[in-house]
């Protein structure tokens, strides 16, 4: 019950959506530093060499606020994907497939409109967003805060993309090792932001 999406602004619990299991909902409210720290902790737990060298410089409210982080070359442990790796996975892994150019990970825009923070039935099958957050189907208006079912949802309740990955569109944002940058028109090997 400490997952932030499980609580309203006054710390009372939301009712979970359609029997969602709290333990199967995504973690949220973690810093980028928390995410790389977790990668190292999981690596150590599984006997793998941690992928990051981390020197924590500031912690606030149990979260790492600042740290010096570097990638350990050739480490066998878990790490965050690069932005390019995340995009490759979200697009379905095959640049020659139609899904590579879909508007959403796993679905194209079904109602012929581009998504611009508006209702779009093309997104309903693959992602949770402000218009389908409670029922899973697009409603006539955005979902407001402090409503039963508002917040994150159990992972895997929507359709997976071509690689079998869920929630690459909607639910929560994912951390990447680097940042987004505009793609060059040419080929780039192992791009980073």
Task: Map each language-model feature to its residues.
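Short, intrinsically disordered, charge-balanced linker/junction segments flanking boundaries
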Residues: 25, 189-193
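Short, low-complexity, polar/charged sequence segments that are solvent-exposed and flexible
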Residues: 98-100, 174-175, 193
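Short, electropositive, low-hydrophobicity segments enriched in small/polar residues
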Residues: 110, 116, 131, 168, ...
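Short, well-ordered junction/capping motifs at the entry into regular secondary structure
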Residues: 67-73, 120-169, 188
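Short loop/turn segments at secondary-structure transitions that flank enzyme active sites
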Residues: 95, 132-135, 169-172, 179-181
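Structural recognition of the beta-strand scaffold that forms the well-ordered cores
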Residues: 26-29, 79-81, 87-88, 127, ...
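Active-site microenvironments of metalloenzymes and redox enzymes
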Residues: 1-123, 180-185
């Amino acid at each position: 019950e400490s997952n932030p999406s499980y609580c309203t602004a006054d710390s009372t619990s939301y009712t979970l959506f359609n029997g969602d299991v709290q333990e199967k909902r995504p973690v949220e409210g973690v810093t980028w530093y928390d995410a790389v720290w977790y990668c190292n902790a999981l690596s150590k737990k599984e006997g793998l060499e941690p992928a990051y060298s981390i020197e924590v410089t500031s912690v606030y409210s149990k979260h790492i606020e600042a740290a010096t982080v570097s990638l350990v070359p050739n480490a066998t442990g878990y790490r965050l994907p690069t932005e390019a790796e995340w995009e490759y996975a979200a697009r379905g892994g095959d640049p020659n497939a139609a899904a590579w150019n879909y508007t959403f990970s796993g679905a194209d825009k079904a109602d012929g409109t581009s998504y611009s923070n508006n209702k779009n039935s093309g997104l309903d099958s693959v992602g949770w967003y402000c218009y389908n957050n409670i029922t899973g189907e697009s409603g006539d208006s955005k979902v407001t805060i402090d409503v039963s079912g508002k917040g994150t949802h159990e992972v895997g309740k929507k359709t997976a993309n071509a690689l079998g990955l869920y929630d690459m569109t909607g639910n929560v944002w994912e951390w990447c090792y680097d940042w987004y940058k505009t793609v060059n028109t040419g080929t780039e090997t192992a791009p980073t932001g």
